[in-house]
Amino acid sequence: MPLEIADALSFFRLSCGRWTSQRSQHHLLHRRAEAGASFIVVEELHKGDARLAEIAQRNNESVERIVGGCWVRWSGSMAWDRAGESHEDQTMFGLIPSDDAGRSGLLLRDRGYAEKAPVAGQFHMDAENGLILTTDYEMMSSLERFWFAGPNLRLRTSTVQGLSNNASCLLYTSPSPRDRNVS
């Protein structure tokens, strides 16, 4: 049963904390699947945080429109990694709602996944309180859906069209909501 989530900012707040992720990535061109795992830390960025002003400036948006956001750090590995290959990085998100309910709008990032330039995606929440994110890059586009199957279980599906043409399914688990606190 989906969790009741009022808006995208509430969805982000539920995502804050420490998570372990299991991933299955399907490389359509190679007709092969690759497994991976990550440790992820998500921290809330409150309205007025200087990092949100930085995201707004990089995306040519007004900081006054941003209602909040997150700072995300991760460390992981994939089955096909070469020696010394690292999957450690971080990014920041800022939310700009386009409706009064805060369930659709722009998701600003300081940089994209594949491209290191700032990027803005369109988000909306569906009837099951899943967060749908569509991001268009110069050479590709991605469609992602994030949702909570319970307070300690978050899921994500992702389809990338363009250079890599892959599909992913991710499972995020956390011990309990109170254990997700990041200090």
Regions found by a protein language model. Name each.
Residues 35, 88-91, 116-119, 140-143, ...:
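Short, surface-exposed coil-to-beta transition loops
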Residues 139-152, 159-163:
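Mixed-charge, glycine-accented linear interaction segment located at domain edges/termini
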